[in-house]
Amino acid sequence: FDPTTGMSDEEKKKFIDKLYKKIKSGKKLSADEMQYLRMNDPVTYAKMAKVQIQRKALESRLKQAKSKEEALEIYTSAKSRISDDDPAREELNAAYDDAYGEFKKSEQYKKLPATEKEAKEKEKNGTSRSSWNKDITGDTKFTENEEETYEFGISGDFEGEE
């Protein structure tokens, strides 16, 4: 099934223009867009099938990052592994840039500590940004570790706290 079936010439042109703009900008492609490529541009389809799979793999690795620093390392490492002679080099670079940009906008990224050192300290101390509790009166209470940290003026990065 060709997704452009039943479209006017103008609608087809818009669909195709939008599709190739998405490819150039590294955006995710819909099932209809992939189907169109499979039927009408098999070379680009093969490239984009690979790009979409590798983009998903990068997104998955980014979600496992324990710090913003680690997320950046994952992204730069993925980009550095793109071969100069890869026929999908341009599309992969755009997809990785887009995936990393989208991840940086996410709540998950905003809640990550800045460095791996901070992430390890939080893990070691058992503190997390969501460990605040409310007592019966509605007052915010710190967990024991956070209270000690607060008392000694070594406050953690609580940016983005909900």
Task: Give, region by region, the residue ranges found by the protein language model.
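Type III/flagellar secretion export determinants
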Residues: 1-162
